[in-house]
Amino acid sequence: MAVPKKRTSISKKRIRKNIWKRKGYWTSLKAFSLGKSLSTGNSKSFFVQQNK
């Protein structure tokens, strides 16, 4: 079984954590933007059936 040789420094741990958080932020921003475009009817990537 692989065992890490040395303890990861606090700064490296913080950098990795921030990268992980940033990915989540951008994903949520994209999802919000897509939801907004769907609700306003400006979406070019989805075909939404509108009931009249």
From Swiss-Prot:
Subcellular location: Plastid, Chloroplast
One Pfam match: Ribosomal_L32p
One Gene Ontology cellular component: large ribosomal subunit
Entry superkingdom: Eukaryota
Keywords: Chloroplast, Plastid, Ribonucleoprotein, Ribosomal protein
Record's keyword annotation contains Transmembrane helix: no
Family statement drawn from the similarity comment of this UniProt entry: Belongs to the bacterial ribosomal protein bL32 family.
Protein name: Large ribosomal subunit protein bL32c
Organism: Capsella bursa-pastoris
